[in-house]
Amino acid sequence: MDRCEKLRDNLYGVELLTGSITPVKEHIVQIFYIVNNTDNSEFIENEALLMITQFGKTEYNFCGRHSELWQRIFNDTALKIYPTDSEKVITRKYESTEKFADELSLVLQEKYFVPTDFYLIYDDEEMYRQVVGMTE
């Protein structure tokens, strides 16, 4: 798979361990993580640090076996980066693949005044294919 696969106009699929995202100037992003296999706290903290410093206060959505850990580490990392800022990095954890896919479908249908890109980052290809299929 390419490092960043374009799935439709503004939706991209990215494999967690080998993929990469390059921010586009004047675009906002929403990021959706499928995290079934990655539970290394140091790796997650490095990912959170990289993403929050690159994309700032955007929305990070998590689904999968390790979503609670990812959400907690992203929240903790955001507090380290923005300790006194009242506007927080937004994180959401979804209990089911269906609710996660529904949220992704919903945001893809919305109209935005500012160009918006959506990234589906995954560490479980089977679940990734399932979510992509549910959003078509």
What are these regions (language model features)?
Residues 2-136:
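ATP-dependent carboxylate-amine ligase
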